[in-house]
Design a protein with these regions (language model features):
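Glycine-biased, low-complexity coil/linker segments
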Residues: 13-15
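Active-site-adjacent structural elements in enzyme catalytic cores
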Residues: 21-225
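Ser/Thr/Pro/Gly-rich low-complexity, intrinsically disordered segments
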Residues: 7-10
Length: 225
């Protein structure tokens, strides 16, 4: 079972003034550019953030920085050799940089994104080696302005995974940013408060080998052309 005390504290937070606020309030639009730049700097430095999506709060890092990805894998107890990893992209053109997208899949994604879906596609060699162990990558383009704006400003994908959760836990520790910060604040570099989050995961759609399969029905209902 996940124990938030087991992973080491974030190296980026060590030595900082305790008064330095690690819970940052953001809004759908008109955010302070300095606040956004602070997030980008953390990600570029290999740091981890917790942030809202159109489904649930997630842990994220720079999607091309392997050490940061490894930190998230340790926190989530993910074996990248056995589990698909997912990234958030800003738009469809950036998706095609990191995943192989044929015409049919492109039309399907264009019809359903942004939205609460994870599309499983074959990855390209632009992804770090840790992704290429399984040759597939989950693609997210959430209908959430905060997460997409971060991806746009970062000019790179965000490696993303939902928060660790145990069945007996109060759901507020998955949805309330202040409680999320209380539980996970010591093992990430910043928690972004985007309001109360959801509890329903994304719908996972596998689009490899010329087949389409709903692997997990979640919040999104897929509309085919």
């Amino acid at each position: 079972p996940f124990n938030p005390l087991v992973p080491p504290p974030s190296p980026l937070r060590e030595g900082r003034d305790e008064a330095f606020n690690m819970l940052l309030k953001l809004y759908d639009k008109n955010n302070n550019p300095q606040d956004l730049q602070r997030i980008i700097d953390i990600l570029n430095d290999g740091g981890l953030i917790i942030y809202p999506t159109d489904t649930m709060y997630a842990i994220g890092c720079h999607g091309l920085k392997e050490r940061a990805i490894e930190r998230i894998c340790r926190i989530k107890e993910i074996d990248p050799r056995k589990n698909n990893l997912s990234i958030i992209c800003y738009d469809l053109s950036s998706i095609s940089e990191y995943a192989k997208v044929d015409n049919n899949v492109f039309k399907l994604m264009k019809h359903n994104l942004p939205g609460p879906f994870t599309f499983i596609l074959n990855g390209t060699n632009r992804l770090p080696k840790i992704f290429r162990n399984r040759k597939e990558v989950g693609i997210r383009m959430p209908d959430n302005n905060i997460s997409r704006e971060i991806a746009r400003l970062l000019d790179a994908p965000i490696m993303t995974t939902t928060l660790p959760y145990e069945e007996h836990e109060d759901l507020e520790y998955m949805t309330d940013p202040e409680l999320i910060d209380e539980k996970f604040g010591d093992i990430v570099d910043l928690v972004i408060d985007g309001g109360i989050g959801g509890i329903e995961p994304s719908t996972v759609v596998k689009c490899t080998d010329n087949e389409l399969e709903i692997v997990r029905q979640g919040k999104g209902w897929l509309e085919e052309n």
